Amino acid sequence: MKPLGNSNLRILIADDQTDVLEALRLLLKAEGFHIEQATSPAAILAAIEARDFDVVLMDLNYSRDTTSGQEGLDLLSRIQAIDSILPVVVMTAWGTVNLAVEAMRRGARDFIQKPWENERLLSVVRTQIELSQALRRGLRLEAENRLLRAEGRPALIAEAPSMEPVLQLIARVGPSDAN
């Protein structure tokens, strides 16, 4: 697979196991992504509050001998409160259908079972980035449209001095019954 060539795309990868972080870093960096890492729920939240990310890939378990995924599920709700559009893809080696459903219910955009397949992981990451970018573009356009339609804003914008005679003519003819 060829690299995307876009190092402007920033991914936060989060896991308490350094070998998992390193494997993800190598895979994603080879695809042209800028990678940041976190090893705890507190570090994840701090990173998200400090910087913008295009996607978060995060483990669900951070404490030793924990396989319930509860830490990650609780973290999902907190991430959603910070940025509800940020796509979060959760990962775990202890996945069940119930855990996947609960993660999605709390805001995860996808669920990846460890060990992962590289092609599927890359496909999920790309898809989530594209969907997030489209959603953010749509929200920006909605905001621009609201501004453009705001009351008191002229329907015609013409600032050049050469347009002054045209605007005067429109002002005279506009209120008349002429067609």
Regions found by a protein language model. Give the residues of each.
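Acidic, metal-coordinating helix/loop segments flanking the phosphotransfer/catalytic sites
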Residues: 12, 37-55, 64-67
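C-terminal output helix
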Residues: 42-43, 98, 112, 116-125, ...
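Short amphipathic alpha-helix used as the core "switch/output" element in two-component signaling
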Residues: 46, 61, 65-84, 102
